[in-house]
Amino acid sequence: MMLRVSPSPAAAVPTQLSGAPATPAPVVRVAAPRGVASPSAGAACRAAGKGKEVLSGVVFQPFEEIKGELALVPQSPDKSLARHKFVDDCEAALNEQINVEYNASYAYHSLFAYFDRDNVALKGFAKFFKESSDEEREHAEKLMEYQNKRGGRVRLQSIVTPLTEFDHPEKGDALYAMELALALEKLVNEKLHNLHGVATRCNDPQLTDFIESEFLEEQGEAINKISKYVAQLRRVGKGHGVWHFDQMLLEEEA
């Protein structure tokens, strides 16, 4: 830091000529002693507010700070380089949710196969359940991509064999299948809430944000949509109304 120093008063008095402008005093710059700040520098570094505390002016020294953080970069080739603040409980909970989504996809695929039979031939229901199966599989893949993104390891688990027959003596196959779908969506929603709870308990804001933004809102919409389908199918009964409902599903956009 350089300070402006004026020479002695005697040296500063120039020879004044009649009518000539005064010569400005020379300015000499000298280095301030180490550890001593000029008043203007101190004022520039004062904290906002009451202005009583003088700050150092240094906010972040990256190369100094990362020296103590190099342990965060693993040297072993079998360790993830991207993993940071991602605990084992969250990794395990994500793998469980992947399994939930794949099981839901498998169950919907079985419903699709049933309604696509030649002796059932409700193509609208088959289309709806096929799209639902694809959606659940996409959810599983999205969770797998996120697991890899955070440096976790995807561990696929067994899938339970689903039902293959969905006829019901009182409700009929259409209503019974849609009630099963509603129960399945509520179960998936419950599992997502459990995953969110694990992320919250482990203080993982990135995972909680991912679940909220990518899954929970969509899950609520799916529950509401299928709830309305169940209500409508209860009104139409097992007769001719099921065919009309099937046509509605066939024409509906995904």
From Swiss-Prot:
CDD domains: Euk_Ferritin
PANTHER family found in the cross-reference section: FERRITIN, FERRITIN-1, CHLOROPLASTIC
Catalytic activity: 4 Fe(2+) + O2 + 4 H(+) = 4 Fe(3+) + 2 H2O
SUPFAM superfamilies in the cross-refs: Ferritin-like
Gene from which this protein is expressed: FER1
GO MF, one annotated term: ferroxidase activity
Keyword Chloroplast: yes
InterPro entries (alphabetical): Ferritin, Ferritin-like, Ferritin-like_diiron, Ferritin-like_SF, Ferritin_CS, Ferritin_DPS_dom
Organism domain of life: Eukaryota
Primary localization: plastid
Subcellular location: Plastid, Chloroplast; Plastid
Chain segment of the transit peptide: 1-46
Natural source organism: Zea mays
Enzyme Commission identifier(s): 1.16.3.1
Region feature (Disordered): 1-20
Tissue expression: Ferritins accumulate in seed during maturation. Then, they are degraded during the first days of germination. Present in roots and leaves after iron treatment.
GO terms for cellular component: chloroplast; cytoplasm
Region called Extension peptide (EP), residue ranges: 47-83
Family to which the UniProt record says this protein belongs: Belongs to the ferritin family.
Record-given protein name: Ferritin-1, chloroplastic
PROSITE patterns: FERRITIN_1, FERRITIN_2, FERRITIN_LIKE
Keyword Iron included in the entry's annotation: yes
